[in-house]
Amino acid sequence: ALGRVVIYMDADFRGGAEGSYTPRLRSAYVSFKGLTLGRDVTTFCDLQAAPTTIDFQGPNAYNFNFATMIRYEVSFARRHMTFGVAAEMPNVSATYGENFKPMHQRVPDFPMYLQYAWGDDRSSHIRASGVIRNPYMHKVSKNSTTSLLGWGVQFSGTIKCCDWFRLFMNGVYGEGITPYIQDLTGSGLDFTPNPEDPSLVRMMPMWGWQAAGQINITPRLFVSGGYSTLRVQRSHGYYTDDQ
């Protein structure tokens, strides 16, 4: 028997340009026996590691993005530990220049995580996550395809320090992982050409972190605030000063 089967779908009106109110399908999946099939928030995202914010997207170093996936999750050690792994449709955002062209991707992204939770209601946790990517591109000069290796790691969590204060955090580092850092999504910086030799491309190293706190004034009233930052680093001179 399949046991409990969940069929879920949700949508909003943020699918077009800002202020356009274009309908958008966010999630649509079937979940059973630890398997999730369909479209959901990426497995690399720790949904409980960011505070409630006025900004819909959350902190700029967070990663609240959606992907089409096959995911498996399992809890063990009296539900203190949870492991998850997925194959997700890749979303490549790169700067190709004149010597390379985009193409259909052949290999899915592979995000995974291991989480430890504690407390009577398991309301505090820390999580280690990783992702491996293999984006493909077409090399014009040789009329052939080539690929690069992208990867990322993340530490995240939320800690209930006491009844009136909760801490949120995440830190991420990797190469070519713009879909997994909120404000870099769609930036064209997964990989870029070498300004001195446009026939070469390289994955760009990037990192970000955020930390925030929530103060519960009453059971129904709270305030939250935090700090978040991110950066794309140079890699052997790749990407120019004005980017």
Regions found by a protein language model. Give the residues of each.
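Outer-membrane beta-barrel proteins
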Residues: 12-24, 101-103, 133-146
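Outer membrane beta-barrel
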Residues: 1-93, 106-107, 111, 115-119, ...
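C-terminal/domain-terminus segments
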Residues: 6, 93-96, 100, 104, ...
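A short secondary-structure junction signal
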Residues: 48-49, 84, 94-100, 138-142
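Detector for outer-membrane/organellar transmembrane beta-barrel domains
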Residues: 121-242
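Short, surface-exposed alpha-helical recognition segments that flank or form part
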Residues: 60, 102, 201
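Short, surface-exposed, charged loop/turn segments at secondary-structure junctions
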Residues: 101-107, 184-188
